[in-house]
Amino acid sequence: MATILLVGVDLYFRAKLEGLLPAHHVVTSDSVDSPDVVIADIARIEPEEVADAYPETPILGFTNHTDTSGLRRAHAAGFDQVVVRSALVERAPQLVEELTA
């Protein structure tokens, strides 16, 4: 079981991710648990700040398919994986498994 920190994720999508990742412990930034993976909503955060805050933790960023600027910024910041929101919904367990392997 991985501890997954959600950064900038709205409550609706948090509930969706918790349903998609029932085998993992999903927390928010106010948690004291050290994360194994960070999942960040690129449209709601600054990718560089998240990458700087978690330099040793794998980061999975997501946004909508029209946010090409956000996708580029997350890649440039060094996120380990950057996907569109629909791909995260389709492949969340596999993406987390790849990042924690």
Identify the function of each model-found stretch.
Residues 36-37, 80:
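Conserved acidic residues
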Residues 29, 78-93:
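Output/docking surface of receiver
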Residues 1-27:
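Short, charged N-terminal beta->alpha structural module
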Residues 26-34:
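Short acidic low-complexity segments
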Residues 43, 48-81:
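Mid-chain, well-packed structural core segment of small domains
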Residues 94-101:
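Receiver (REC) domain switch/output surface
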Residues 16, 69, 91:
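Phosphate- and divalent-cation-binding pockets in alpha/beta enzyme and binding domains
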